[in-house]
Amino acid sequence: MKRIIIKLSPVLLLVITVTVMAQRIVPQQVKPDFDPYQFPDTLAHRNYDLDSLKAVIGDNKGLPKGFEIAAAIAYSAYPELKDVNIDMVLTDKGAPMEANFNIWSMLLPGKKNRKYKILLNNADKTWFDPILLRSLPFDAQVGILAHELGHIVYYHELNFVQIGIWGLKYVTKDEFHAIHERTTDLMPIYHGLGSQIYQYAYYVRKDPSCVSFYENGKDFMDTYYMTDEELLAEMKQN
């Protein structure tokens, strides 16, 4: 039996290698094939009924405490995610915002059991305080949450092997990383929240509270994410 296993191992390794290499992963986001609801340019200072929003987004969506309305509006822009389990969680560590997936749920057959999380750093006295969700105006909050949901749309189209390849390319190939993030910035535009992602990009670059932060990270931000001017140009084309 051991000899058979030894003889089969190179064959199995070859099959696995070929399978992995055959997975073609592109970094670009894809424009949805439906006409989105076009949200107003300004969503702040309106009366919202959270229960009505929950009825639209489904009961499988977690809402972060204190940001329920902004999160629910962002969810509502993504009808393709209505049946997908997603939680938005406040945390005290990590990046300012990060879309993530439960790796074990990715191993299950089909996609109905997959679980995703959007981690929202809410720690005190971080070096990126100016761009934390709590520091942003309401429309900018909706815009950046819509960006994070765009990542989940992308993840949900991949299988387990593809997710692994994507992650490896994301952290090792700058061009892949940049294309993915910059086209994810387009997802709010594609889902009717162009004004909101524009307001986010404008705020984190132009608001007095963010100027110092932006100047220190300008090269990174403008390489991997669209500027407000670039987003405005895209909005005019869409």
Where are these regions (language model features)?
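Post-HEXXH active-site segment of zinc metalloproteases
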Residues: D139, Y154-R182
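Long, well-structured alpha-helical subdomains associated
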Residues: H177, Y190-N238
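Second-shell loop/turn segments in exported
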Residues: A55-N60, L132, Y170-D174
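Active-site recognition of the HExxH zinc-binding catalytic motif
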Residues: G143-H156
